Amino acid sequence: MSYPDKLVAGINFDGHGLAQSINAMQMDMNIMGIFGENIIGFDKVGYQRKDAVISSFAEYIGSNALSYNVDNQVGRLLMTENPLDLALSEKGYFQILNSNGTIELTRDGRFKINKAGELLTLDNQKVLSSTGNPIILPFVPKELNHISIGLDGKVGVFDAEKRGLVSAGYIGVVSEDGSQVQGNCVRQGYIESSNVTLEREYAEMANYQKSFSANRQMFKIQNNNLSTAISSLGRV
């Protein structure tokens, strides 16, 4: 949208500057929203913070210039000693099957088993193996500590009669593009805290709050100029 530089003789108005201030305030608010999500995600198991990315064409495409990258650095591992709690010590994701048949990636490894021996998330989504199939234990043990999950993700259940482990496949660990992650990165009895540092998020948010205040002040000045120009036109 274009604005005239001069509404009437002797009265100048920068319409482009007004539009820029509006876009800048919207951008600041959207970026602060990303930092807000990170702050909310601080206490979420396996949450990965987001970094705001601003396009070099922000001046021309407004709020559409904002996107984000996911920070895939590994968070701190916390011991729980729960045999069904798993964490990944390297970059990668567990695969879970949603009720609609789609596959979702997560680093939240708080799992459980149902009566059928299926390994599930806390939301009852099925955990997938390295072959892409749901992991099902050959039988449900009386004690959870009879379930063994190795560093390589191999799942086994101790059979007292056979005096050995009965295999139930491997935990599927994949990269963001879905390719298998090789390595010994599965930690049984641990969960991963988020990789959010609150001090960093609050500091970044404070910077954009200052930017928002500056852009709002500029908007007020330009808006007052517009009001003055319109009033002057009424007297012509």
Please name every model-derived segment:
Residues 1-236:
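Amphipathic alpha-helical polymerization modules
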